[in-house]
């Protein structure tokens, strides 16, 4: 006889499974390495009397004043290591930051210093502590006061690096939660290999791991595992899944971490990236507040910004700045308030123009593709740009357009296309330094746009190069795009084409 559970019994089975399965997976997972032992404090020097410490001088000799050699000035502080309340957590690798900076000094001939502070001693001004580094192996929670401080700090241009000591999952999960709590409105995502942090000084692709990580079968991905949260395309928070610190101080204690050489190279690249981006938080767009003269949206050109499963909210001031220039140049009434819309939402059919941007790959659902297809067939226009000129976004966008319109090509627009003619004629544009470096150091080039034509007009307009940094007049050393004047001119032509067609 088969005994079947009653309905009442079956009702709690999913809840039981939801509890038991993760527990079973956790028990089956390899045990993380133990942290290195705490260093024993050095004994205090033996006490000696003053008579023992100074030999008698023969009279009548007068002691000469010793000329002390002045110490060289202290290099500026770059890294501040966070001192938590649990000394058994954060002090396990006491020389990690110091060792990294000494190694960077030898490799790059740049000199920085470090210090140690509790969160209470941190300044919200990044000039006082440019990079905050928190390392430990235990789980932790940020207080509300600490979250408020760190949110202000990263908004001002500061950078936080969370390291999982010995790769411990408790510290890693706590770091992810901390990053989300500091910037809950931004995406937390794994950095793709086209992120500039992997190319800022050393070209990093595949990395080597410590023996324990390999032995436990966790080194399945040969690429570095860093996650981040961005503010206006600047990664302000880094979370490392695998341990840096033991590699920085060449400590051979076993860990789930990077081999010494790659740990140092990754640390050097983070330092290089942060110093290059130190002024990236400043832009003309952030100093200008664009306010609608009236709250009515009727009769105004309205734009919806497409949300997706990648980092989609990039330079928040950029498109309103472009709309303002468009209003000034053409007199077209515009609404500066971009409406965040999902392609699942019927609200997309209430507006004529959608803007899509991002820095990594993304995917649409079948419903989202169907809605976008119908929106475009109804006469709407989709304008997209690869923020920072990132290859991962470019590949994803092309793949999604092929799924939306499998029978049509996203084709390069010829130089004589109407979109390059009005309101300004665009024959050549100037590339930013990052794009020029990728283009055999060519500074002047033809503007590059791609499109999908429906019924004689462009329904999809796409730039594989960054435009929004130019619209915002941003300091963006890694943006592979056009200079501000040309990026704005090209954006104006796109808007003009959309309105007139």
Regions found by a protein language model. Name each.
Residues 75, 170-250, 257-268, 299-302, ...:
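An acidic, glycine-rich "communication" segment
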Residues 14-25:
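Bacterial N-terminal signal peptides
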Residues 110-120, 162-166, 186-194, 280-286, ...:
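Surface-exposed patches in mature extracellular/periplasmic domains of secreted proteins
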Residues 80-81, 130-134, 159-163, 188-190, ...:
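Structural recognition of the beta-strand scaffold that forms the well-ordered cores
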Residues 1-9:
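N-terminal secretory signal peptides that target proteins for export/translocation
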Residues 94-101, 147, 151, 172-176, ...:
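Extracytoplasmic/secreted envelope proteins and their assembly/folding machinery
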Residues 30-131, 135-138, 244-245, 253-353, ...:
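Aromatic-Pro/Gly-enriched surface loop or interdomain linker
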């Amino acid at each position: 006889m088969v005994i079947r559970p009653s309905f009442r019994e079956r009702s709690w089975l999913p809840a039981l499974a939801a509890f038991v399965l993760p527990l079973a997976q956790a028990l089956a997972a390899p045990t993380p390495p133990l942290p290195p032992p705490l260093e024993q404090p050095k004994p205090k020097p033996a006490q000696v009397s003053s008579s023992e410490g100074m030999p008698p001088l023969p009279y009548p000799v007068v002691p000469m004043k010793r000329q002390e050699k002045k110490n060289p000035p202290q290099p500026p502080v770059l890294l501040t290591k966070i001192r938590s309340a649990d000394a058994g957590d954060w002090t396990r690798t006491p020389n990690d930051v110091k060792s990294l900076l000494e190694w960077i000094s030898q490799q790059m001939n740049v000199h920085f210093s470090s210090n140690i502070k509790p969160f209470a001693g941190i300044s919200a001004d990044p000039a006082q502590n440019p990079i905050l580094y928190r390392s430990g192996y235990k789980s932790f929670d940020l207080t509300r006061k600490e979250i408020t401080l760190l949110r202000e700090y990263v908004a001002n241009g500061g950078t936080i690096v969370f390291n999982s000591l010995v790769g411990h999952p408790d510290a890693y999960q706590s770091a992810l939660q901390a990053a989300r709590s500091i910037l809950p409105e931004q995406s937390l995502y794994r950095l793709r290999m086209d992120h500039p942090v992997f190319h800022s000084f050393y070209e990093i692709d595949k990395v080597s791991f410590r023996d324990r990580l390999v032995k436990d079968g966790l080194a399945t991905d040969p690429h570095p595992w860093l996650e981040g949260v961005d503010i206006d395309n600047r990664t302000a928070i880094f979370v490392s899944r695998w341990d840096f610190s033991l590699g920085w101080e060449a400590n051979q204690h076993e860990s789930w971490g990077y081999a010494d050489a790659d740990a140092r190279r990754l640390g050097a690249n983070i330092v290089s990236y942060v110093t290059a981006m130190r002024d990236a938080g400043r832009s003309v767009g952030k100093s200008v507040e664009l306010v609608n003269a009236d709250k009515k949206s009727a009769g105004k050109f309205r734009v919806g910004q497409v949300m997706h499963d990648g980092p989609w909210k990039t330079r928040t001031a950029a498109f309103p700045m472009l709309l303002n220039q468009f209003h000034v140049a053409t007199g077209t009434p515009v609404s500066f308030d971009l409406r965040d819309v999902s392609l699942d939402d019927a609200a997309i059919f209430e507006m004529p123009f959608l803007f899509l941007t991002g820095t990594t790959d993304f995917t649409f659902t079948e419903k989202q593709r169907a809605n976008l297809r119908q929106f475009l067939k109804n006469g709407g226009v989709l304008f997209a740009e690869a923020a920072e000129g990132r290859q991962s976004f470019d590949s994803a966008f092309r793949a999604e357009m092929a799924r939306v319109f499998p029978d049509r090509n996203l084709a390069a627009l010829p130089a004589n296309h109407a979109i390059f003619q009005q309101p300004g004629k665009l024959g050549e544009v100037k590339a930013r330094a990052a794009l020029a470096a990728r283009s055999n150091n060519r500074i002047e080039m033809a503007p590059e746009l791609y499109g999908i034509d429906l019924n004689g007009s462009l329904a999809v307009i796409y730039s594989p190069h960054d435009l929004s940094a130019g619209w915002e007049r941003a300091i963006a050393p890694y943006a592979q795009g056009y200079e501000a004047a040309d990026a704005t001119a090209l954006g104006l032509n796109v808007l003009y084409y959309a309105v007139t067609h």
